[in-house]
Swiss-Prot record:
Segments of skewed composition (Basic and acidic residues): 101-131, 154-165, 197-210, 564-573, 794-824
Gene expressing this chain: ESF1
InterPro entries xref list: Esf1, NUC153, Nucleotide-bd_a/b_plait_sf, RRM_ESF1
Assembly description: Interacts with ABT1. Forms a complex with ABT1 and suppresses the ABT1-induced activation of polymerase II-directed transcription in mammalian cells.
Organism: Homo sapiens
Name of the protein this chain belongs to: ESF1 homolog
GO cellular component: extracellular space; nucleolus; nucleoplasm
Chief subcellular location: nucleus
Stored Gene3D superfamilies: 3.30.70.330
Keywords: Acetylation, Coiled coil, Nucleus, Phosphoprotein, Transcription, Transcription regulation
Length: 851
């Protein structure tokens, strides 16, 4: 302590006391706090494991309880409770010590009286033995009162225990009559040890059971004593031994040592053999009592199904609200095959039972078993048949629906437990409506599939495969619901579903559910080839009457009439006719599409002026074969057409003139001359109307025709050519070596496309910034057309620069001239002007004088 005080007084270490970094964690914070429910792990043998060797092989004596005490501790509230319990236990121990002091005196008196009774004759000592027995039993009752709880009721095991005691007593009586007094004593002592062992072993389940057994023994012995006869005098010793066993059973760990000491004192007179037996019994008692004490300390271990909870009526009412009463539903979870008979015979056919037949089809099972079959094994087919139970239930469901639904009241809530379990029970029964028959080539194939697949879960469906062998003499006369002999594994898609009844708390009833395959197929987009090969009967839902008739045929009832058979045949014929009509419609649609593909006519109509005329011309040209003419021939044809038109117009004019002017008209007459002139004017107007409208309109028509020709310019088949832009770019960027290789293979694609750089419509590419081409952009691809555009852009830019330079030079020259003019002195310029004017005046005077 002095050294510690010196360290703390030292200024260098003074901050250690205040700095939390140097503080040690208190012991209560070091351990993990646990609930009182886990208190038993500190002293229960189930949690105890002794280590004889450490991890390096050195011998040690260590147990897991030490580790548990090191790391875990009870919470504060539980520790307070444990403190109160310890007080109560200490008080009980004090009471037990008081009772045991009395018990020692009683046991000594009993031993002395036992010796006296052995020495005396049986006839003379009957009254005394009866009195002693009654006194001993009364004393044992008083000693046991402190250990027996008044609230505990007797268990069922107590009856067995009492019956065994009676049997053992009868054996003891027989031994005593045959042997001498000394042998009697030995047999009696051995009998006591046996009586003590047997109830300890059989009735060591809980402490309460032991205490109930004690009560029954005491009542039985008291009744037996009162009704005893002269031939059963030796039961007194057995009763005394029972009292000793009762005291051993009802005692705790600490009181047990005192009982063993009393047993040893009483056993000194009987011999060394009895001492050894008693020691063994005491050791067993200690172990069992320690376990009982552990259980009593830790309380009932409900997690392991041990112990009972006694609650009041109020608690029972509360729990009844929370947990509903059991309605008697015991579902066969994973035990649907428990009633199936077992046999060693292996056949080539397997039966698949207890599956979700609403979702599973024969092809699903065939695909599954094909993946498990051995090499060389073959599965011929998988057929799904209705069971006899399924037929009966389906008949009932057609009339009134599931029986389980009828038993549920209408006003029952949706989350009602009983109604939900009834539906679950129905779904479990629905698994037995059908069964599948797997036909294999050999018993070896069937046994291999059985070993690998029996009890296996199908995907994640919560339905487990139940396989059984079918004897060879069994035949199936019913029509199968579904058959599968082949599966296209490349196109097959596995089914992912979950049976709600077997995998979830909520239950979905499936008796009126539509076929899931039908839903998926109708929602899917079909291809044209699939529509032709499709079986429409699988996806077209027939009327309810037809369904009933078809199901009656499948069930094979004997009571079906001839008229009903006729109706079903008619319905089948109607369905076939409908299917044939659908197929004809599909064939017509496909033929039209094929014709369209052959013609390759995909027209896009744009309403442009002059479209009708141009379309008529195109049709005429195609009919006459003019579209295949060369440009020169087309030019000649146009000239010929113009000549034909002129000839027609002349002929029409001549006919009109002949019709209008009669033969007897005198043209020299002035009256007729004026009329002829008017007719001429009218002719000219008619000709002009025939030739066309005004020149402005003719110009507009020509312009529209030019636009139309430009639009229809690419309609010629010779000009049509497909090109792959990406391949052109790739081939242009290749090295010379690779280009040569492609040239040899004739796979090199050359860029023959030529851009009209001078087209006025695309001049904005060279001037506007919106269409600027950036060669540094990653999306830029170098082609011949792009190079031409860039060259043209550069050329136009140079031209603009030259124009700018020329304009600048002109301006500079003009500025220089102006500057030169401005550079002359104004006085000098005035002098020059005055000289000029004077010279002009002088010359003018001179001329006048000369005249």
């Amino acid at each position: 302590m002095s050294s510690k005080q010196e360290i703390m007084s030292d200024q260098r270490f003074r901050r250690v006391a205040k700095d939390p970094r140097f503080w040690e964690m208190p012991e209560k914070d070091r351990k993990v706090k646990i609930d009182k429910r886990f208190r038993a792990m500190f002293h229960d043998k189930k949690f105890k494991l002794n280590y004889a060797v450490d991890k390096r092989g050195r011998p040690i004596s260590h147990s897991t309880t030490e580790d548990l005490k090191r790391f875990y501790d009870l919470s504060d509230s539980d520790s307070n409770l444990s403190g109160e319990d310890s007080k109560a236990l200490s008080q009980k121990k004090i009471k037990k010590k008081k009772t045991q002091t009395k018990k020692e005196i009683d046991s000594k008196n009993l031993v002395e009286k036992k010796k006296e009774t052995k020495k005396a004759n049986h006839k003379g000592s009957e009254n005394k033995t009866d009195l002693d027995n009654s006194i001993g039993i009364k004393k044992m009752k008083t000693s046991c009162k402190f250990k027996i709880d008044s609230n505990i009721s007797p268990k069922k095991d107590s009856k067995e225990f009492t019956q065994k005691n009676k049997k053992e007593k009868k054996n003891i009586v027989q031994h005593t009559t045959d042997s001498s007094l000394e042998e009697k004593q030995r047999t009696l002592d051995s009998g006591t040890s046996e009586i003590v062992k047997s109830p300890r072993i059989e009735c060591s389940k809980t402490r309460r059971e032991m205490q109930s057994v004690v009560q029954l023994i005491m009542t039985r012995d008291s009744d037996g004593y009162e009704n005893s006869t002269d031939g059963e005098m030796c039961d007194k010793d057995a009763l005394e031994e029972d009292s000793e066993s009762v005291s051993e059973i009802g005692s705790d760990e600490e009181s047990e040592n005192e009982i063993t000491s009393v047993g040893r004192a009483s056993g000194d007179d009987d011999g060394s053999e009895d001492d050894e037996e008693e020691d063994e019994d005491e050791e067993e008692d200690e172990d069992e009592d320690s376990e009982d004490d552990d259980k009593s300390d830790s309380g009932p271990d409900l997690a392991r199904g041990k112990g009972n909870i006694e609650t009041s009526s109020e608690d029972e009412d509360d729990t009844a609200d929370l947990f509903p009463e059991e309605s008697g539903f015991e579902h066969a979870w994973r035990e649907l095959d428990k009633d199936a008979p077992r046999a060693d015979e292996i056949t080539r056919r397997l039966a698949v039972c207890n599956m979700d037949w609403d979702r599973l089809k024969a092809k699903d099972l065939l695909a599954l078993f094909n993946s498990f079959k051995p090499k060389g094994g073959v599965i011929f087919s998988v057929k799904i048949y209705p069971s006899e139970f399924g037929k009966e239930r389906m008949k009932e469901e057609q009339v009134q629906g599931p029986v389980e639904l009828l038993s549920i009241p209408e006003d029952a809530p949706e989350k009602d437990w009983t109604s939900r379990e009834k539906l679950r029970d129905y779904q479990f029964k629905r698994l037995k409506y059908y069964y599948a028959v797997v036909d294999c080539d050999s018993p070896e194939t069937a046994s291999k599939i059985y070993e690998d697949c029996d009890g296996l879960e199908f995907e994640s469906s919560c339905s487990f495969i139940d396989l059984r062998f079918i004897p060879d003499d069994i035949t199936f006369d019913d029509e199968p619901k579904d058959v599968a002999s082949e599966v296209n594994l490349t196109a097959y898609k596995p089914k992912y579903f979950t049976s709600a009844a077997m995998g979830t708390s909520t239950v979905e009833i499936t008796w009126d559910e539509t076929d899931h395959e039908r839903i998926t197929m109708l929602n899917r987009k079909f291809k044209k080839e699939e529509l032709l090969d499709m079986d429409f009967q699988a996806y077209l839902a027939s009327s309810s009457e037809d369904e009933e008739e078809i199901e009656e045929e499948l069930q094979g009832d004997d009571g079906v009439n001839v008229e009903e058979d006729g109706k079903t045949k008619k319905s089948q014929k109607d369905d076939e006719e409908q299917i044939a009509k659908y197929r004809q419609l599909l064939q017509v649609i496909q033929e039209k599409e094929k014709k369209g593909k052959e013609n390759d006519m995909e027209m896009e109509i744009k309403w442009v002026p002059g479209l009708k005329e141009s379309a008529e011309e195109m049709v005429k040209n195609k009919l006459e074969g003019k579209d295949k003419l060369t440009p020169w021939e087309q030019f000649l044809e146009k000239k010929k057409e113009k000549k034909r038109l002129k000839r027609k117009q002349k002929a029409l004019a001549e006919e009109a003139s002949e019709e209008e002017l009669p033969s007897d008209v005198d043209l020299n007459d002035p009256y007729f001359a004026e009329e002829v002139k008017q007719i001429g004017i009218n002719k000219k107007s008619v000709k002009s109307a025939k030739d066309g409208t005004s020149p402005e309109e003719e110009i507009e028509i020509e312009r529209q025709k030019a636009e139309m020709a430009l639009l229809m310019m690419d309609e010629d088949e010779d000009s049509k050519k497909h090109f792959n832009y990406n391949k052109i770019v790739e081939h242009q960027n290749l090295s010379k070596k690779k280009k040569k290789q492609l040239m040899k293979k004739k796979e090199l694609i050359e860029d023959d496309f030529e851009v009209n750089v001078n087209d006025a419509r695309f001049q904005a590419m060279y001037t506007s910034h919106l269409f600027n081409l950036d060669p540094s952009d990653p999306n830029f691809k170098k082609t011949k057309a792009m190079e031409k555009i860039l060259e043209e852009k550069a050329r136009q830019r140079e031209r603009k620069e030259q124009e700018l330079t020329q304009a600048i030079k002109k301006k500079e020259s003009e500025i220089e001239k102006e500057s030169q003019r401005k550079s002359i002195d104004p006085a000098l310029s005035m002098l020059i002007k005055s000289i000029k004017t004077k010279t002009e005046q002088f010359q003018a005077r001179k001329k006048q004088k000369v005249k």
